Amino acid sequence: MAVSLSASARRRTAKLRRHVRVRKKVSGTPIRPRLVVTRSSRHIYAQVIDDVAGHTLASASTLEDGLRASDGDKSAKAREVGRLVAERARAAGIDAVVFDRGGRTYHGRIAALADAAREGGLNF
């Protein structure tokens, strides 16, 4: 007998499955750290992480004072976070990263952040 799930439970399960599938393949090294993108309904966060040492090398989010007060839609703020994290990673001597979309589909705010990080000089 099959158990039927609600629509939200199916989405949550699918996201978890995607996240596990991506994390099996993606790992950050000191030479090529992992750019992790985390998204909520209101904010977006980006961190550059060296998984070997377990350290965050650079980060940016919409919770920062300059971005929190800025006008614009959520995609514009995601682009600004991407630009900021690329700038901070480059200042830390990082040119190449592995992109970890955190189980989210590569669309909308996730894609906007990734494109802005590429324009900022990070190679994926």
UniProtKB/Swiss-Prot annotation:
Keyword Metal-binding listed: no
GO molecular function (one): 5S rRNA binding
UniProt KW keywords: Ribonucleoprotein, Ribosomal protein, RNA-binding, rRNA-binding
Record carries keyword RNA-binding: yes
CDD domains named in the record: Ribosomal_L18_L5e (cd00432)
Matching InterPro entries: Ribosomal_uL18_bac-type, Ribosomal_uL18_bac/euk
A GO biological process held by the record: translation
GO cellular component terms, semicolon-separated: cytosolic large ribosomal subunit
Entry similarity comment: Belongs to the universal ribosomal protein uL18 family.
Function (record text): This is one of the proteins that bind and probably mediate the attachment of the 5S RNA into the large ribosomal subunit, where it forms part of the central protuberance.
Quaternary structure note: Part of the 50S ribosomal subunit; part of the 5S rRNA/L5/L18/L25 subcomplex. Contacts the 5S and 23S rRNAs.
Stored NCBIfam families: L18_bact
Protein name: Large ribosomal subunit protein uL18
Gene assigned in the entry: rplR
